[in-house]
Amino acid sequence: KRITINEARKVVYKIPNKIFYKKIKSSLVAVSIIVILSFLAFYNLKPESLLERSIRILKSAKDTSIPPEFDEAVSAIRNNKFPLDNIDLSGANFQCKDLSSLTLRRGIFIGIRGTGVNFDSSNLYLAQFGRFSELNASSFKNALMDESNFENANMIGSSLNNTIARSANFKNATLNGANLSNGDFTSSDFSKVNFTQAELNSTNMRYTILTEANLQDVNVSNADLRDTIGLDQKMLDKTCFSPKNPPIVSAPLIINARSCYNNESKHKERQIMQHALKVVGMMSILNGFCDKGKVINRPPDIPSRPDLNIEIPISSNDI
């Protein structure tokens, strides 16, 4: 077959074009790889922000002792109002620490060592504190804890004033000497809870489960105990209240007057007993007490040397 000059030229011209386009394609691929690698290198070398560092430090507390920078990290997160939803801090040691005013929705705190921890004004919606978490002398004032779980938690002498914890689970928790005054615990489960010497002054306990709960010497002044499950007359008769502010109960339960105290001296005695429960709750776990966010070790008293005994401070909030 004969090939004309024009056809030969076309074949010759196609060869360098193919080579040219291959080179262009290879160059573009190489440039793309360089750009991607440069971006990744820049991203990895970018300085860690204070907030990112703080979150990393807080998360590192899981199942171990807290790092030295913990307090500063929490403060930075709080100041930035950064939410820590779904954070897992199970087994962390938060003894005497300040975790107030944080957003910790659906947080997992199972088995934490939280004696004396402060969660005041924090959002703990659906948080998990079950499985024998240590929370003696802890504080949850003004916290939002709807549907949270505190089953089997030790909470002796804890403060839950003005707390909103509707449909929460406190089953089998220890709340001896705890203060739940002015809180809303509607529909929560308090079955088998030990409430001895606790304060439920003006507390909304409607529709709660109180089956087998210990209500010995519990102040239920002005508390709403209507439609509770498991509350019988024998249990109610163990409670006490101000004659001027009896609790609200559902029939056939009857209010039998039993005052928690009849003078200021008796009132002070009751407060001292509650504070003693709080101190015992701390001492049994810490062998000491909380003071300004730190654990203060307190050895046993020496009868022959009272000058060496360490006094436990009592603030106006305690009594």
Report the location of each language-model feature.
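Tandem repeat scaffolds
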Residues: 3-8, 13-22, 42-49, 65, ...
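General structural signal for alpha-helix termini and helix-helix connectors
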Residues: 37, 60-63
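Alpha-helical transmembrane signal-anchor/signal-peptide segments
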Residues: 47-58
